Amino acid sequence: MDNRNPKVTDALRHDVEASWHRFLDLYEPLRPELYRYCRHLTRSPWDADDLVQDALFRAFARLGCMNEMPGNPRAWLFRIASNLWIDRVRAQKPEPEPDPQRASSREPRAVREAAGTLLSRLSPQERAAVVLKEAFNFTLEEIAEALSTTQGTVKSALHRGRGKLIEPVYQVEASPKPAVLDAFCAAFNAGDVDRLTSLLLDTAEIEVVRVHTEYGPEAARRGGFQGMLFGTRRLADPARLAGLDPAFFRNVLPQVPRVELRLHRGEWLLVHWYAHSDGDAVRAITRVEADGDRLTRVRNYFYTPDVLGEICAELQLPFRSNGYRYWKEA
C-alpha cells in the first residue's frame, strides 16, 4: 500500500470510519452499563470513560478477526474491559512505603485509590468478581466468562473479595486554582479567541474527547476553540446539523456558551453552560493542565453523557446530553 497516496489513505479512513459507526450502532446500547461497570473498577469517572473507549476499540479490532459474532455481546464487552483493567493494575509497579510528609493532593486520585484499595485490599480479579456479582447480578457462569476463568475460581474470588472489600471515604484536598484558569474563563466568556490561544503553550494539546485532537495555538484557533465558542450556531439550526442528531439539540439557542469554574473532588473544572429556550443547562465540561501561566492540555468532554451526567448530578447542575457520537457529513 502506498501510504503517500491521499486517495488511498482517504478511502481507507472513510471505510474504517463507516465500519466503526456500524459497530457502534450495534454495541452502543450497552455503553451505559459498561460505563457503570468500569466506574466500579476504576472509581474515577474520567478513568472509567477512558476504559470504556479502550474496550470498545479493542472489541472493534477483535471483531474483524473472529469467525462469528459473540454469542453474548454484554459478557464479551465486560470481559474485554475486565482484562484491560486487570492488566493495567497488574502492570503497576509496587509503590514504596508511603511517606506522610510527601503526601500531596497532586498525586493522581486514581493512583492513590488503586494503591489504597485495589492493590492492598483486593486483587484485580477479586474486585471484578464482586462488582459483577453484587452490582450487575451476573451468574457464576457469566462472571467466569467475563473474567476468562472457571466457576470455582470465581467462587473463591467472591469469598475472599467480599471479606476485604471496604470502600474507604477519601478526604480529597482541593488543588490550588491556577490563575490561568480565571484568565481562560474571562477570555472564553468574552468570545476572544486571540486571548484564549495566547494562554496555550506552543506544544499544547487540545482535544474534544473521542472526536479529534489538535496541537498548538494556531490549530486550536482554527478548530477546537471555534467549536467550543461558536458551535451553538450550528446546534440551534437543524438545517446545519450535519453530523449531529437533532433529537439532542432541541431548544438550543444560538448564543455563545459561558464557562465557570467548579470544584469537583479536589479538581477545578470548567463547566460550560448553554442557553436553551427552557433554561440554561450544562452540555460540556473541560479539564485542563497548566504549567505556570500557560495551558499544556485542554480536554473538552462534550460527547460523554455518562461522565457529564455523573458529575453534574454530584454538583447539582442541570445537564443536557449531546449523545455519544459525532457524525461527519457524507
Q: Across the structure, where does each feature detected by a protein language model lie?
A:
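A short, charge-rich alpha-helical start-of-domain segment used by transcription regulators
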Residues: 2-36, 46
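C-terminal and inter-domain tail/linker signature
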Residues: 20-24, 32, 40-46, 54-57, ...
